[in-house]
Amino acid sequence: MISFNPVVARPHSFSAKPICSAFHTTGATAATTRRRFSPTSANVSAKQIVEHVVLVRVKTEVEHSKINDMVNNLYNLSSLPQVLHLTTGPVLRTQSPTLSFTHLLHSRYESTSDLEEYNTHPLHLSAVKNFLFPVIDDIMVADWIADDFAGSVEVGPGSIIRVKLLKLKEGLSENERTEIVDVTKRLKQKISMIDQLTVGENIVQARTKGFSIASIGVFGGLGAVHALDAQSAALNDQKDGVRGFVDDIVVVDYAVPANTLIK
């Protein structure tokens, strides 16, 4: 059985590359979020979006002002025209037997080409090189396509985002990988407090640490998350459906704040 005791990994050094998308080898005392208001960011049904999640661990010795600069500069990326939604800041908790993260960035795009343009934009490259990489010692990235996305692309203040990443055993068949995705998707039908759920295979080519299945659950607040955790039967059904295929799991909870910059 996989336990969830966070451990501290060894520090890493990072080259000045964009945080990777499917095409690249590639928070703070408060958190920030911003959404682009347009017809495409309203409620939608049965459409495709691209999820982008970056998890980082800030070095323990970093000054708070530099952490704030990191979060603010990542937040400013929400002004880019490709971004439908972006939120970033410190995580509530990380559950993992092997990894520990302090900050999260979550954003959404209409297509992989939009994500590609975001990743190669000079504002993004500058934020990563000058404000992100100098203050962190670990990073993991997950991008995936949600083909059956429904609801709002915006995740409102007060919501809780739960990111779950799975590292699969080697040698699994395509049918087995598909079953893992389908088992996770079925959670939305079984558990009413999940407002939104997307899941898919990680299309990133680097900085994945071998985690190839990613999902995001959106909840109305901490009360909904606590209610989910109390529903052991439904959760155990999901765990039983994937346990034999999984080597490692990372679960990160994050509270979406109001869209204010850190000072």
Feature roles, as predicted:
Residues T120-V128:
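A short mixed-secondary-structure module that forms the rim of ligand-binding clefts
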Residues I2-H106, E110-T120, P134-N236, D240-K263:
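Short S/T/G/P-rich N-terminal loop/turn motif that feeds into the first structured element of a domain
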